[in-house]
Amino acid sequence: SVSSSFPFSLLRNKIGKQRKNTIRDGFEDILEERRNSSDLKYALRCYAPVLYKGVTPCKANMLKNIVLQSDQLHYVINQVSQESGEAPDIIQEEASVILEEMAHRLQISTVRFFAFALSKAFKTLFQHVCVNEEGIQRLQQAIQEHPVVLLPSHRSYMDFLLMSYILYTYDLALPVIAAGMDFMGMKFVGEMLRMSGAFFIRRSFGGDKLYWAVFSEYVKTMLRNGFAPIEFFLEGTRSRTCKSLTPKLGLLNIVIEPFFKGEVFDVNLVPVSISYERILEESLYARELLGVPKPKESTSGLLKARRILSEDYGSIHVYFGQPVSVRSLAQGKVNRSKYNLFPRHIPRKPMEETQSFVNDTAYRIVRLQEDNMVLKPWVLMASLLLQNLEGLELSVLTEQTLWLRGLALSYAAFLDWPDHAPTAKVVSSSLALHRGLACVSGGRVSLVVGEPLGPVTPEEALFNRAVSVLSCASYRNQVLHVFLRPAMLAVAMHTAASSRKNEVYNCFSFLWDVFSNDFILCPGDTVQDFEEACYLLVKTGAVQMPQQDIEMTDRGQPILSFFNGLLEPFLQGYQVVCRYLCEEASEGLTEKQYIPAVRSFAVKLILAGNLRCYEVLSSDMQKNALAALLRMDFNYSYIWVVKSHFAVGMFVLTKAVLARL
């Protein structure tokens, strides 16, 4: 449990100093020049990027030859040959086919075509594309000194096109980008992406030892040679909820390994935060979360999507964070000398301390991405509307948005709020941009529900309402990282048996563990997160801490009430999953059956009036709830008591319940 004698004054000084020093760069709108000059001239201009000082100049074919002749790949080829009984030459040919399918073929003519086409598209779609120039300058310096790995957040298909467009604009080396095999199947477009720097990989490799060897050697060869910055999405896939996803470690392990083996002096990891004022795929994501199959990537689908060009998607902010030195991070954490005990070309499973280091690094990078996400007024408005599904008077929404703005800024949120603009104008402007999600009628603001074309069943009406709620939730989710820790403390205070700090901490710790699949909570940071939450709530006057108690102040009631409401959908979602597992789940339930079964169970509860939360229908929440239950230690029973605005649920979860899965 948390120390009863923790020096909170020291913590206040430490966190206060950190937040005071959180000075972020300013932005430049790169579309401003595009609106005032020739796009063709821009695309055909002299492009002479600064390169890594240790670069080994080579063309794509030379790069492939280096990979195919590498000692590590030959070792695996011989291993696979012995296991399969096939001749090494045949396995070598398989490796060559895999590499041919995978490798990029960067061509400047294709890059120039994209530069021209994207200029036209971006000027139509977006009001501004804002980039922090100081971040670009830091990146330019980093690229010259050491191999660079770009790690953008991933919320839209637009992300990797946007990244390459920005680097081309600033005359920086274009990255080679890890892309899913889905894109390769797009006629013409797949090859164009390949010729603009994309290399294609399978979504999963299974136990394919040869594929993994070709893939990892290809990436490491590009890194060692300084061929180009490497770009991939640490989250692995687009976040349909606009919350950060638990990082995937495979590619990160690969790009860090050359440093551990002494093949490069250092590797710079650059977190990039891409913030969309309005998400292109907002309704598509909501439907996917409700079980509608994801549309297959195709050229015809891309052409049909041209209708989005008639829409206004507001602004994009792209923030290039401080380059993170792997060498500095690893100092005192990983003993690199152990790597000298084995031949470098023999693939080995990462050591435990290395796995721990890579995992910790991945979480820290995603936290840096979150910290530099730019929040627009709409994310605050969406947070308020979701806690008032019956709607709010426009004047009340305006007043509460201003209040929430102050709270967010006091918690060091990176908020893009128009200078000197009246709050009423900011709110009306946001409502106009997001008119597909919210509308004003009779002076009252409420969520928009799609109009049915004909008679609908109660289930269909519920689905339409859920699409609206989940679309709105994707914006609310963008501010969760700012309020998460104080919100968990607010729920813990509401749930704890007493106001004693240790009691509250125990509830906080349980919530922290439960929600570790839904939010980015760095392993081992439970106490630190609790202490930060205490500091922030004390700072805003929401709680006071006499002796060993944590007590709400008179001023704290609206703050704690808002925070409880913020996590209410997640509490209710997990509660519904627990109810389903305890009351409904049958023997031998598979994961494939689990999602539709829980959704059907939740639909019945909503239609019967026993549940008011539409977010419990989200497959993302249902998967995360199950993952949390399976991850946690159920050697003894947990009594889950969830107090909420609507209900108190108590469920005994035991191994016997989970054994049904």
Predicted feature locations:
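Membrane-interfacial terminal anchoring regions of lipid-handling membrane enzymes
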Residues: 1-661
